[in-house]
Amino acid sequence: MYEPKPEHRFTFGLWTVGNVGRDPFGDAVRERLDPVYVGHKLAELGVHGVNLHDEDLIPRGTPPAERDQIVRRFKRALDETGLKVPMVTGNLFSDPGFKDGGFTSRDPWVRAYAFRKSLETMDLGAELGAEIYVVWPGREGAEVEATGKARKVWDWVREPLNFMAAYAEDQGYGYRFALEPKPNEPRGDIYFATVGSMLALIHTLERPERFGLNPEFAHETMAGLNFVHAVAQALDAGKLLHIDLNGQRMNRFDQDLRFGSENLKAAFLLVDLLESSGYQGPRHFDAHALRTEDEEGVWAFARGCMRTYLILKERAEAFREDPEVKELLAAYYQEDPAALPLMDPYSHEKAEALKRAELPLEAKRHRGYALERLDQLAVEYLLGVRG
């Protein structure tokens, strides 16, 4: 019942299960895994696809002939396993040249390098069949505001995004670009901090129809925000192209914990939203095994992410089918049809009628909404003691 299959559209990045456990205070605790080996292992686990940064597959500085050999070998593994590459993304954060930004560096040569690296990653992704290109502006931020740079970065980031969309069109690539917000880390503050800020940016681009969002559970939670609300807004805008799932404690550094290991109720409500919304995109686990783990623990982590998602999916579906839940929701959303015409599209006459209308507010002020009972039922389904 909780066994992952490719049709569940679960994906992992090469950098997730390939994480070697290095952190700011300690060296690697695991060996780097061969991308071909990772692909075969993920396929054995029932995964739909594997995502990658350019440098996850092709180390920086690799000569062209060697690069082509690496790609051929990886494509052969994809053919052998049936694994897809739904998404690629450019690493614009590791190279020391990006220390003060890639797209938003004050140095035009660094910006040009970020442009070129992005185009090369698009070419790589097209070879591998990718349809989504994620843009994560991890270095596009600041610690020192005295530069006044915050007034300039919006044009600087629009230029490459417009360029990349035009390049995709020129090359016949079907990419849609998923922008990934984050409030901070590795920079003290990142300019493109939340789902709302990215949605606002998209509408200033030349080809907004090619752009959407890749929200991440941890990133909105780091800022103390409600991730379910963020995803719902992206869905409402028709801009949820991809999603990063993991676990995160509020107001901490980016922990990238196993999905559902923290904030379990939020994870339950997120799965409920995704599965009831018609979202057809990948369910990508942008997380990694704890530093305490060896390779066996890495695969236990990957299985755990998917199993938890499927358990929460089953629990959410059972919750929505519960007769008492349906009754409570029907009562909650019951509307008096007499009130609805007061909120019809504006006209001068309707505005005057609204100001004259008798509103039965006294009864509304004393009404209870039974949300305590509804929430208790959700908790009981989550705990597995009901349904």
Swiss-Prot record:
It holds the Pfam family AP_endonuc_2. Keywords: Carbohydrate metabolism, Cytoplasm, Isomerase, Magnesium, Metal-binding, Xylose metabolism. Mg(2+) 1 binds at E180, E216, D244, D286. InterPro entries: Xyl_isomerase-like_sf, Xyl_isomerase-like_TIM-brl, XylA_actinobac, Xylose_isomerase. One of its GO terms (cellular component) is cytoplasm. GO terms for molecular function: magnesium ion binding; xylose isomerase activity. Binds 2 magnesium ions per subunit. The active site is at H53, D56. Mg(2+) 2 binds at E216, H219, D254, D256. It catalyses: alpha-D-xylose = alpha-D-xylulofuranose. Belongs to the xylose isomerase family. This is Xylose isomerase. It comes from Thermus caldophilus.
